[in-house]
Amino acid sequence: METNPTLGGVFGGGGLFGIGYALGVIEGLRERGIDLHGCPMLGTSAGSWAAAATALKVSYKDLAGLEVPTFPNPRAGVLAASAREVFGNATDPTVRVVVTEVPRLRRTVLSGADTPLADLVAASSAVPGLLAPQRINGRRYVDGGVRSGVSVDLADGAERLVIIAPLAGAMFGPFGRFVERRTDAEQRIWSETHSGTFIEFAPRAVTAGIASRPQHLFDKARALEAYFCGLDEARQRTIE
C-alpha cells in the first residue's frame, strides 16, 4: 500500500473517550476532503485503535460494539482477543504504534507492516496495573502513554500533520494543560527535522465536560458523546 506523504496523523491516548473523540475528528476531516486512510499514522494507546480503525476502514460503530474487559484484568491476551474481533489478523504498513517496553520503560515504536494490528493496539493500550503486558516477538510491552500521551516527535514527516490529543486542552484542568505543553514541545522537536504544518485538535470545554473524572474515560456512553463532539469540532474547524 502506498502512503500519502502530503498528509499524516498522530493520535494520542484517552481511553474509550479518546477513541471516540479521535474517530469523530477523523470522520469529520474525511467529510471535508482530508482523508487519513492510506496515510502514515502513529497512535498511542487509544490513538493506536483510531489509527488501526482508520487504516482498515473499521467504523466507530463496530468498535463501540466490542465488550470492554473488566478492570483490573490480569489475564494475558484479553485485550488482543477483543481487538481481533474487529481487526482480525490484518497488518498494515501505514500504522505505527507507541509502546513502552518493560522492564526498562523504554519508549518504542512498532510497525504494523509485519505485526497484526490487534496485537499492536493491545500492547499500546496495556495500562499498568489494569491489564497484563502484551508480548510481541518475545518482548513485553505496556501502554505507550506511560512515557508520552501523544509522541508527536516520533511521527513520520508530512506536509500536513493531523494531531489529535484527547487528553490535552480543556481536559482535567492542570493535567490537560500539562499534556498540551508536552505536545507543543514534541511539535518543536518534530519541526527540527520536518518542514510540515500542523492541524491540531484537543477537546473543547463542552467536549471535556463529558469526562470530568478519570473513570469517565472508560464509559462507553460518554465515548459515544465524544465521537459526535469530535465530529462537530472537525466540521466546524477553520482549516487553511
Language-model region placement:
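Patatin-like phospholipase
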Residues: M1-T44, A52-E240
